[in-house]
């Protein structure tokens, strides 16, 4: 059992001293626990510094190993530079006109989640049936989270493989979720997690992430003549024509 009144997370961390932590065949050796059967999801590279054992709300146990001296091969140079605009209708739109779908994993599972939560509310407190209902909800949340993480990892890896420099906007999701009409959609999109993945993977693979100031008027700027039209401050304007050169723009591609 995990016991920590100051931390809601169910986890503990052990430092590696000598060979008290090591990966075996279909098992991992941990201090005080010995060899514990497990499914190895990734090849362990480098020297192990510590192991963190955790349990998620659905009752599954995980071991995360912190390693050093692990070499990551840089990706081949492509010479490509793109800008990425994050959104809700499309998860992201690149400056070369490619729109990446927003799968809205939470929204797709909301009806099922609401049904399970209603069932939970009818169960007697402290009963085994209530624990089972709570576990079902935790497993659904885990499924939604895994879907989202899988998409973010695949998309971030793809963009870094295809481009040397990626420009992204310095968004402030914490401020944006104050809009209650968009809060759930913004949280479901996980823009901050996507940026985090891009930044650490870029460092791994020898690529570069450029963060653009959030007040830079990219949606108002004409890419043809560099003129600025303030009419796009109205978010309902999705397409506009530059009054200077007559070039037509999609606000997401700009």
Feature map (PLM): residue ranges:
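Positively charged, helix-rich recognition surfaces that bind polyanionic ligands
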Residues: 42-47, 55-254
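Acidic carboxylate diad motif detector
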Residues: 1-56
């Amino acid at each position: 059992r995990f016991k920590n009144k100051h931390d809601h997370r169910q986890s503990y961390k052990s430092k590696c001293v000598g060979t008290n932590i090591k990966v075996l065949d279909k098992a991992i050796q941990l201090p005080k626990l010995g060899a514990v059967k497990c499914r190895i999801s990734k090849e362990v590279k480098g020297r192990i510094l510590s192991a963190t054992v955790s349990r998620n709300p659905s009752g599954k146990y995980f071991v995360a190993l912190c390693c050093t001296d692990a070499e990551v091969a840089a990706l081949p140079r492509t010479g490509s530079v793109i800008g990425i605009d994050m959104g809700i209708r499309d998860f992201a739109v690149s400056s070369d006109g490619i729109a990446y779908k927003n799968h809205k994993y939470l929204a797709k599972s909301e009806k099922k989640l609401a049904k399970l939560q209603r069932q939970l509310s009818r169960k007697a407190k402290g009963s085994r049936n209530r624990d089972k209902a709570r576990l079902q909800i935790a497993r659904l949340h885990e499924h939604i989270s895994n879907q989202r993480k899988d998409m973010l990892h695949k998309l971030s890896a793809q963009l870094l493989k295809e481009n040397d420099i990626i420009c992204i906007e310095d968004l402030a999701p914490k401020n944006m979720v104050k809009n209650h009409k968009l809060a759930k959609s913004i949280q479901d999109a996980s823009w901050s997690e996507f940026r985090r993945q891009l930044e650490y993977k870029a460092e791994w693979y020898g690529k570069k992430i450029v963060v653009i100031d959030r007040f830079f008027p990219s949606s108002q700027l004409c890419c043809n003549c560099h003129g600025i039209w303030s009419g796009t401050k109205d978010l309902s304007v999705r397409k506009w024509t530059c009054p200077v050169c007559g070039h037509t723009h999609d606000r997401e591609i700009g």
